């Protein structure tokens, strides 16, 4: 036996003899099985924990990861703790945890995996923190989560459903994940003075759960045609929640007019009056200047056929994932941050999202979508376009590339004012598109020859150096591009030119436009394109017979002989 072994063994015996019988030494880097983050270290915490190994559990009060004297507790009974910091470590295997009514802001740790029951009612946990905790929770089937219904988000509900857990209200009643329920949540810190008018069409069995107990009480029938919602921040999280049970085919939300304001005299024409009038059309901001955000959970309101939210309501979160029959969804003018759409097989045909705050969006599974507007937003990427789409307006976003599938039925495409560097069409010919607006992007080379039926193309305000065009285009705008030359004449005698209107203004490098055979051309704008000389203009303008053409150009750019030649061809300036 070596001297080194004997020395280590002796040291181990010395360390062991120094420990008290009541102490259990853990490694210094051992993390708690469950860690609770607290809103305040000055307030006592009362919790109830269950464990199938009660002798090995303790609450670490001093943060040394050791079971010291006074840190044991009796499982199954409430224990009150005086925390010494803003975190509380729970050690040992636990089967249930009740922290209801406590100022807990976050729960984490591998010990969540073994829980079979958890009560989180009336805590300061955000819905996001609960969702994060549930990623580890619910590994064992048949567990129970006690939580207020208004805090049960679609993600929480789906996670619990996947692991066959139950969600229980504080009063002990079960929350049916399949019950038709509409939930509206207003996120606000202060009491609001504005109201929202909610209208429901085709309603059946509608009632408003005023006291949030999950049971229909005597005065909770929903008035015919809808109701006006006041939005006081009455809940502990600073939220206002309305839970509507029943079913309806149509839902609309509008800013409710104040009856007192309607009866009052109209304000005088002044800035103060204008500001007051404006306040009637938008929800009032919080005192700190932040806007009220509305969240709509219609994921279980499966009977909906249409939903519309008025511009200015500040709707931020919408979930219609369970509304497979939904045909029209109008949310324009609201800063949508999250949107959960129905899965594949839905009936959604019209989607209006102008002014949203989304960065990415997947609409590929919306196989029946025909109209989609998401202009003036923050989209950076959009997944492939569904083939049934007819109208697409994504102007005013941050898109850098887009591919149009060859089987698309798209007729109108508006991508104005994006950041496009790449724009492609799958396949050799695309017969559907009639209008293509690519103005205000970063495109340098474009091949649009596959758009064989496109009538209007606008590629203005691009650093464009080359372009291939369809032969039967009628209107073309290439203003503010870097093109040096453009050929609009038919490529062969089998074709003829259909172009009627050309805007080639402010093209600093443009020196030649071949258009002498474009006999249908009746409007040409060359203003600001000073590199294009007068003799080239007079020689290339087509001879008009049955039409009269209009040429827009600065005075003094054409000589008298050039002017005479142009007028002789049927053109006026």
PLM features per residue range, with description:
Residues 93, 113-115, 139-144, 247, ...:
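Leucine-rich repeat
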Residues 50, 110, 201, 299, ...:
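Tandem-repeat architecture and repeat-register "anchor" residues
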Residues 97, 118-120, 143-150, 251, ...:
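Conserved hydrophobic beta-strand positions in leucine-rich repeat
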Residues 1-16:
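Sec-dependent bacterial lipoprotein signal peptides
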Residues 107, 128, 133, 296, ...:
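Canonical leucine-rich repeat
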Residues 134, 292-294, 358, 399, ...:
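Extracellular beta-strand/beta-solenoid scaffold signature
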Residues 18-306, 311-313, 324, 519, ...:
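N-terminal capping/linker segments that flank leucine-rich repeat
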